[in-house]
Amino acid sequence: MFILRDLLRPLQAHFSDTDLGRERSSLFAYTLLAVIVPFTSSITSNLLRSLVTLFGIEIKKKRFYTFMASSTLPWQKLWQTVWGLIPSPETEGRLLVALDDCINPKIGKNIFGCETIFDHAAKANQSQYPWAQNLVAVGLLKQVKGRWACLFLDFRFYFAKKTIDAEKVTAKIKGVVVPFQTKLELAGQMLIGIGHYFPTSPLLAVTDSWFGNQSLWRPVRKVLGDRFHILSRLRCNSVLYAQPDASQPGQRGRRRKYGKRLGSATQMAAEVRQKAKTYTVNLYGKDRDVCAYDAVVMLKTLKCPVRVVWVFRK
């Protein structure tokens, strides 16, 4: 419990010294404890039940739900305090961060950040257009007991342009509509913030193919420089190009940006499979042998040299 006290006090210090601030500070700490205690799943109704049953806190349901849906919590200060509490964030000399977007379904109609969103991953018994919050989140990847774990470092609410143009109540903070930003812009802001907080650590963002393009790469690379890299999945139909040849003396015109067309990632996989080598990697908590081949090529989605790794099943 002393460890929890030392972790929670720096977080509580960011709340104001008013009656409301002290109430929120205490409620914030106890809510975190309710999440940690293996009592039940961490949905809002179960957290309220934990506060009442385990900690004896008397609070009205509407009051607690208002607190949980608050748009004025000092998240930026809280997140930076959390970053400072991580004892050894680096893995082999660099920060590994996962980047993705997700949705958080809700029921209340006036909850901040909510709108009708298309869920491309909806199951057969789920609505494809749930009423939910759309989040872009970044988390720190660390190995815990031989398996990879993700510790959230930051998040942003994403609003569709039509929601902001309509000035919906769920897109307002203190009566002011939030400015529109794309998911890539939100992700770039978070990565730049993390890079500034850890000014000497190389930063590797692990993401899917949707975020792996120059709209994220270029602005973050411009600020963080060579410290920033992206590891993303590659679409099977992505076209690969060889690196351009060096300019010859007396050659007219500018140097070519791309070399010859090599084909799609799938076509290249068939050609390089015989050249694959066996590597031992830690996969799902065990050291396993994996066949892989890599090559440096050019991609028009990033407009720069990219190392592509093909991993083959045995």
Task: State what each model feature region is.
Residues F67-K162, K277, V281-N282, A292-V296:
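Active-site-proximal, Lys/Arg-enriched surface segment
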Residues T18-F28, N125-W131:
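Structural motif
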Residues M1-T18, K106, N110-I111, K145-C150, ...:
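Single, function-defining residue in the core of a domain
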Residues V37, L54, T72, E92, ...:
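Short gly/ser-rich anion-binding loops that grip negatively charged ligand groups
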Residues A29-F39:
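Short, amphipathic alpha-helical "recognition" segments used to contact nucleic acids or chromatin
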Residues F39-T116, G193, G212, W217, ...:
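Electropositive nucleic-acid engagement tracts
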